[in-house]
């Protein structure tokens, strides 16, 4: 990526990119991926599983890789054609190559957030199960499957409108038009699952992603309806969530005094946590050629670690800092490059993690943040000590004095030590570069 250009770094979870991230294992999550699949294969019965991680931590990529590999192993089990690149990658990874699964799975991916404008979440979810079950498995009788789905929908009431079953069966676009009441939802669901599962896999894994981003009423209803209506022993659910945010979402629905944590424990039989990425490894992935200034690369990595950034936050920070590097140049030392690396690195990290603190820092009211970084971020300390002062000067005192000069309204006309001098021109250029 050119240093003076901006490009979205967050990758879309397309099949091609999901395969490539598995092949390269750029963020070292293949071990976690394999461990999850091995555990999943050992679980008996109908269960609801949570995969917990922060927003932007890469949950969608992880569950998409689960979907990819479960399909791969099922195709292998039935002697069906597999994706050549994926087949090559699996055969090159000993643990994945030697994995023997006792069950075959059809994974169904459902983005809850994309459907939270629908009144009845179960209709959206079941529609995804039916359509993906058919689209991925051509052998399923489409008309029979839709007939079973129509029977299920007839038990999910929206208003008082009766469904036209023949129209629904022949016109999939009319699936959401209307429903009528019945007492046979569970039996109808069992029939639907029979159509998908019988002879073609042992289990369905329904992956529900982005639930914590949904409307509170939608998130609550999808949890409750899933638990109460679907208890087929062949069907498992994996909910990809940020548990902390989902707890807030539930409290918005039931009230702040509601014990949302205990409430969630009623639904999830197993809970898995997705570990944070290794920032150094991820930086290697983003900047494989190491074309940038060595200090700036190390600083990005250590600052992301210090502020505990998620993968998405890392992408934003990396993009901004690389762009700034392109503006200050990399040909040796300059006063502008020095103060920009010192302060822009903190300001943009704070803006990503806590915009209010970023504003306090810019206003000159957060010197303690600077002191903490000087003490705890090794490469930052090295850079300060290398350039800001020599001999009789205390580096931390000099750094704090430079901070006051840059961000205090009562600052003097310049900052000077025996190694560097920063004046009003440098300060003006810094703020110009900062907000480009």
Q: Model-flagged regions — what are they?
A:
Residues 86-87, 141-162, 270-343:
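Conserved AAA+ ATPase small/helical "lid" subdomain
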Residues 46-50, 107, 203-205:
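Residue-level preference for the first positions of well-ordered beta-strands
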Residues 50-54, 111, 208:
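Residues at the beta-strand->loop junction immediately N-terminal to the Walker
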Residues 1-96, 422-436:
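Walker A/P-loop-proximal flanking segment of P-loop NTPase domains
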Residues 2-20, 24-33, 54, 69, ...:
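The catalytic "switch" region of P-loop NTPases
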Residues 57-195, 367:
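P-loop NTPase nucleotide-binding core
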Residues 298, 302-306, 311-436:
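C-terminal alpha-helical "lid" subdomain
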Residues 208-214:
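Conserved Walker B
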């Amino acid at each position: 990526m050119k240093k003076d250009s901006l490009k979205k770094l967050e990758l879309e979870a397309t099949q091609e990119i999901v395969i490539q991230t598995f092949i390269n294992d750029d963020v070292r999550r293949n071990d976690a991926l394999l461990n999850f699949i091995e555990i999943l294969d050992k679980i008996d019965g109908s269960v609801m599983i949570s995969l917990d991680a922060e927003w932007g931590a890469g949950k969608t990529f992880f569950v998409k890789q689960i979907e990819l590999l479960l399909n791969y192993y099922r195709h292998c089990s039935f002697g069906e054609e597999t994706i050549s690149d994926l087949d090559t990658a699996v055969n090159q990874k000993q643990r994945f190559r030697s994995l023997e699964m006792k069950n075959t799975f059809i994974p169904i991916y459902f983005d809850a957030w994309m459907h939270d404008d629908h009144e009845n979440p179960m209709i959206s979810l079941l529609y995804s199960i039916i359509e993906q079950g058919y689209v991925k498995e051509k052998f399923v009788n489409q008309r029979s499957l839709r007939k079973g789905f129509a029977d299920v929908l007839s038990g999910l009431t929206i208003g008082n409108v009766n469904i036209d079953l023949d129209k629904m069966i022949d016109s999939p676009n009319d699936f959401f038009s209307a429903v009528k009441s019945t007492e046979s939802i569970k039996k109808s669901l069992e029939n639907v699952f029979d159509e998908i599962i019988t002879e073609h896999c042992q289990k369905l894994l329904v992956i529900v992603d982005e639930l914590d981003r949904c409307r509170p009423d939608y998130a609550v209803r999808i949890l409750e309806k899933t638990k109460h209506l679907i208890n087929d022993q062949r069907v498992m659910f994996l909910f990809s969530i940020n548990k902390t945010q989902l707890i807030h979402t539930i409290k918005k629905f039931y009230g702040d005094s509601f014990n949302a944590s205990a409430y969630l424990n009623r639904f999830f039989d197993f809970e898995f946590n997705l570990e944070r990425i290794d920032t150094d490894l991820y930086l290697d992935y983003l900047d494989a050629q190491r074309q940038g200034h060595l200090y700036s690369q190390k600083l990005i990595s250590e600052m992301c670690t210090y502020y505990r950034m998620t993968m998405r936050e890392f992408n934003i920070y990396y993009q901004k800092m690389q762009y700034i590097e392109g503006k200050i140049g990399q040909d040796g030392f300059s006063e502008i490059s020095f103060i920009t690396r010192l302060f822009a690195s903190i300001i943009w990290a704070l803006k990503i993690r806590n915009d209010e603190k970023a504003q306090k820092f810019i206003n000159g009211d957060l010197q303690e943040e600077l002191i903490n970084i000087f003490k705890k971020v090794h490469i930052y300390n090295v850079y300060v000590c290398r350039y800001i002062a020599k001999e009789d000067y205390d580096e931390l005192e000099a750094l704090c004095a430079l901070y006051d000069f840059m961000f205090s309204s009562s600052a003097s006309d310049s900052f000077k030590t025996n190694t560097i001098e920063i004046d009003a021109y440098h300060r003006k250029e810094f703020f110009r570069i900062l907000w480009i």
